[in-house]
From Swiss-Prot:
Catalysed reactions, semicolon-separated: 4-hydroxy-4-methyl-2-oxoglutarate = 2 pyruvate; oxaloacetate + H(+) = pyruvate + CO2
Name this polypeptide is given: Putative 4-hydroxy-4-methyl-2-oxoglutarate aldolase
PANTHER family: 4-HYDROXY-4-METHYL-2-OXOGLUTARATE ALDOLASE 3-RELATED, REGULATOR OF RIBONUCLEASE ACTIVITY A
Taxonomic path: Bacteria, Pseudomonadati, Pseudomonadota, Gammaproteobacteria, Pseudomonadales
Function: Catalyzes the aldol cleavage of 4-hydroxy-4-methyl-2-oxoglutarate (HMG) into 2 molecules of pyruvate. Also contains a secondary oxaloacetate (OAA) decarboxylase activity due to the common pyruvate enolate transition state formed following C-C bond cleavage in the retro-aldol and decarboxylation reactions.
Cofactor(s) essential for the protein: a divalent metal cation
EC number in record: 4.1.3.17, 4.1.1.112
Pfam families associated with the record: RraA-like (PF03737)
Family, per entry: Belongs to the class II aldolase/RraA-like family.
Listed InterPro entries: RraA, RraA/RraA-like, RraA/RraA-like_sf
Amino acid sequence: MHYLTPDLCDAYPDLIQVVEPMFSNFGGRDSFGGQIVTLKCFEDNSRVREQVELDGKGKVLVVDGGGSLRCALLGDMLADKAAKNGWEGMLIYGCIRDVDVIAQTDLGVQALASHPKKTEKRGIGELNVPVTFGGVTFRPGEYLYADNNGVIISPSTLTMPE
């Protein structure tokens, strides 16, 4: 499904919250949306790997990486796995790498920046807990919509106006 966040903002002004404009679009999908699954991890993408191996149909993985700009929480192999397992997209409060390959992957990906270094693997991270960044709190089960205009969240599913 193709989403236009300005149209959703106009149609649902009382339902949406707009995430502060700090993310860049890196994925092969310019527009994505779905039910939020949250993950809080700092400079360790072990739990990201676990999540992308699961069925992600209709879901968006929101990763709170603490805003770290010191390593990448997502690379081409995990992005490919997420796409193959049906994930709609990922919003990463941190960095990614392998950006040229990810740009060709059928997955929405927004992140702060790119960084060539991989993370440590310590198996640390909290799944499906509320995470706060960009001026909003992302809650598991709520909905996220993203495109080149920005990122919005809503407590319920939104449909594009006609």
